Regions:
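N-terminal membrane-anchoring alpha-helices
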Residues: 1-57
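Glycine-rich helix-loop-beta junction characteristic of Rossmann-like nucleotide cofactor-binding loops
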Residues: 62-67
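Catalytic core of membrane glycerolipid acyltransferases/transacylases, capturing the structured
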Residues: 21-40, 52-53, 68-125
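Generic preference for hydrophobic
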Residues: 60, 74, 96, 204-206
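Short gly/ser/thr-rich secondary-structure transition/capping motifs
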Residues: 53-61, 129-130, 186-188
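Thr-Gly-centered strand-to-loop micro-motif
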Residues: 61, 97-99, 120-122, 150, ...
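Amphipathic coiled-coil/heptad-repeat helices and related helical stalk/stem segments
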Residues: 59, 80, 104, 132-133, ...
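Non-catalytic C-terminal accessory region of glycerolipid acyltransferases
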Residues: 130-242
Length: 242
């Protein structure tokens, strides 16, 4: 019953913020090409979602690695839809890369469009990469970062699986750093039956960024494996420290 009430509250809250975002987009468009105003409204929405339940805890580590004046390609592990709001604890203006099917979800898809997120068709790999590079470089040029799940899909067992090359190709072509982010605890916030777990802790850790010079010079596959290993090691350490 409590979960149903909170879901209803979230629908009303998201509707309100969606209207605010549409107004902000129109009003700020002439001088806000990176859609920072819309993104900041999304951050307020996310903070509200996480802060109301009294026994939900969020721990954020490694923010000293974040330069708010830089654009990054953000890579993070993917377990559940809760990964998306959790990333808003990182103080950067970013655009998500998401599969086309998500943009077709009523209400949520419209929110992604307002936010300016990047839609790709995973069924057409070459076209998806072209779209990612074109749209990703556009947003980076405007001063935003781009957030990507390099595994390409959710992990069923909670481990970090093999990375795809798209995020690393974008970082190399755009000449920006890669910012690895590791999440733990998002998978347990919603139970398998769809009800909320009212006692939950999420930990987000930002790892040191990968310099653009290293991305440009190092073998792409070796670089992907190195970042993967660093993130996996961080996840194991976070779990040991629960």
């Amino acid at each position: 019953m409590l979960s149903a009430i909170y879901y209803l509250f979230l629908v009303l809250l998201c509707t309100f913020f969606m209207i605010l975002s549409a107004v902000a987009l129109v009003v700020c468009m002439p001088f806000d090409k990176s859609r920072r105003a819309v993104h900041e409204l999304s951050r307020v929405l996310v903070r509200t979602f996480f802060l109301i339940p009294p026994l939900w805890r969020q721990r954020v580590e490694g923010l000293e690695h974040v330069d708010r004046n830089k654009s990054y390609v953000i890579v993070l592990n993917h377990n559940t839809v809760i990964d998306i709001p959790a990333l808003y604890y990182v103080p950067l203006n970013f655009r998500w890369v998401s599969k086309r099917e998500v943009f077709r979800v009523p209400f949520f898809g419209q929110y992604l469009v307002l936010h300016g997120d990047i839609c790709i068709d995973r069924g057409r790999a070459s076209e998806a990469l072209e779209q990612l590079l074109r749209e990703g470089k556009k947003w980076i040029a405007r001063g935003a970062s781009v957030a990507i799940f390099p595994e390409g899909t959710r992990s069923k067992d909670g481990e970090i699986h093999r990375f795809k090359a798209g995020a690393f190709t974008l970082a190399r072509e755009a000449g920006v750093e890669i910012l690895p982010v590791v999440l733990d605890g998002t998978k347990t916030l919603i139970r398998k039956n769809g009800l909320f777990n009212w006692r939950n802790r999420i930990t987000l850790r930002v790892l040191p960024p990968v310099p653009a010079e290293r991305i440009a010079s190092e073998d792409p596959h070796a670089l992907m494996q190195s970042v993967h290993d660093d993130m996996s090691a961080a996840l194991a350490e976070m779990r040991n420290n629960r």
